Amino acid sequence: MVDIQARTWRAGRFWWDSSRPSEVGPHSLRALVFDLDALTDVECGGHRLAFNAAFAAHGLTLNWSVSRYRKLLALRDERQRVAAELRARGVCTECDVLLKVLVDEVCTTKSMMVDEMMLDADLDPRPGLVDLITDAFTTGVAVGVVSSGRRQWVEPLVRQLVGDGLVQTIVTADDVTTPGDAYRLALAELGAPARDALVFRGAPTSLRAALDAGLAGVLVDPGTPGARPDYDGLRVADCQRLHAQLWSSGIRSAAA
């Protein structure tokens, strides 16, 4: 694979606090790409509830609170999270041969339930999101969304969150198998090269895929110190300045 130069916004340097005018870089901002977590708290407001329902379906007296689930999100894979919880509660030991079987059963049940539960979940767009996407639409900046979920619930959820006609493309697990390919396909469908796009991510663990696709990115997560908490007051002009600063500064990082 070609080594694509990737840049991301680092926590701790706040562009909106800078009094110096931003430098105009050689790349124009032609597209904004959001992962689904950047639109709403889909993990705690959707996946967490599906896991709790799956635990109950298997007779397990486990119920993840928001705070507990956020801690477990440090583990990248949902099977690791379930296994860690089962061991912590003494349901299975580290060497228990039934651990893998039970983890697989819980995750399979959760996957079936999430398709039905997600649209009924009480999910709201992050503050300022709709205003930013509307501004992008009116100024001619393309908007795309990528998700590891199924199209049957991702597409209607996006419409539920931001309305019809404002998002030009939605890439889901039905289209590609890896997060990096999701970003690449979204850019291809938007007609924008990676260097002319800005990605908004809703979780630190999604950083690597955006980096691998050669994208500059912003972390929007109220639960991560140093990250932007939401989109309140953010407009396309601000995104253009940030995009130029990211590329002109040469910031490169594998951590948010």
Q: What role is predicted for each listed range?
A:
Residues 72-118, 127:
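A metal-dependent, Asp-based hydrolase signature
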